[in-house]
């Protein structure tokens, strides 16, 4: 590009947990010599999933009811994670981390359990988990077609066109509040899904929508039904059913059932 940005598209490769090196060399236009080289080590080939939403997607594994057991088990699965900063800042300043006892506490609890479930069923496929979620946010902030799209521009667009396998979405509590017109969610959720897919340009990748569980918030039943109708209308949208879980806490303390 004129501003110096560039991109390389790699041919499809089979999934592999074999550590590899990516070597990037820059040529000096005056001498013709390759004088600037960057080496990225421990590169693996697998699936990358993006987790979006508000506080329940953002809440870290350290706060889960089964945190100790989950964290001690974190290194047993080939998971890597990337947390987008919650202030809409410079996404590029964030780095990938390897899931382990010393790092897993910072992972999204829902996304950890989702990734662990995938890893257990696809042991030969490395799993990368990107989480971009902000507490107390309405859906209109996550899609320009649904409203302001401010967080979409700040925390989702910079990730494009990062190759994704799919998206997990856990959001809707804010839109069920009494001061909100919850009926808009019937249009906002499918438009968000369509906008993300269109802007990524990778086809109709899967969306896994976490169903709003039992909780004492005004119009939660409307948001829950909007999630269901969106799921029924799109063969590439699936629902993670949670209505059968005990309790009515807006922040369920045990996240494993919400991630599988």
PLM region spans:
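Cell-envelope and extracellular/periplasmic
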Residues: 1-260
């Amino acid at each position: 590009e004129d501003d110096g940005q560039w991109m390389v598209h790699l041919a499809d490769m089979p999934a592999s947990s074999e550590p590899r090196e990516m070597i990037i060399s820059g040529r000096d236009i005056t001498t013709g010599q390759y004088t600037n080289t960057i080496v990225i080590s421990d590169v693996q080939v697998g699936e990358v999933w993006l987790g979006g939403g508000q506080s329940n997607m953002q809440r870290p594994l350290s706060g889960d009811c089964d945190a100790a057991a989950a964290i001690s088990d974190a290194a047993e699965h080939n998971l890597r994670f990337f947390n987008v900063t919650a202030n809409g800042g410079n996404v590029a300043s964030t780095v990938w981390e390897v899931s382990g006892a010393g790092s897993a506490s910072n992972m999204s609890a829902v996304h950890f359990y989702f990734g662990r479930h995938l890893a257990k069923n696809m042991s030969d496929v490395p799993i990368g988990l990107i989480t971009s979620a902000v507490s107390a946010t309405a859906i209109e902030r996550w899609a320009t077609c649904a409203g302001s799209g401010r967080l979409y521009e700040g925390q989702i667009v910079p990730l494009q066109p990062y190759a994704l396998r799919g998206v997990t979405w856990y959001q809707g509590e804010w839109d069920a509040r009494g001061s909100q017109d919850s009926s808009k969610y019937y249009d906002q959720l499918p438009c968000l899904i369509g906008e993300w897919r269109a802007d990524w340009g990778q086809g109709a990748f899967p969306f896994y929508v976490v169903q709003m569980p039992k909780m004492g918030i005004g119009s939660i039943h409307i948001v829950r039904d909007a999630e269901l109708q969106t799921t029924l209308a799109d063969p590439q949208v699936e629902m993670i059913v949670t209505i059968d879980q005990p309790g009515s806490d807006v922040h369920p303390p045990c996240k494993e059932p919400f991630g599988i």
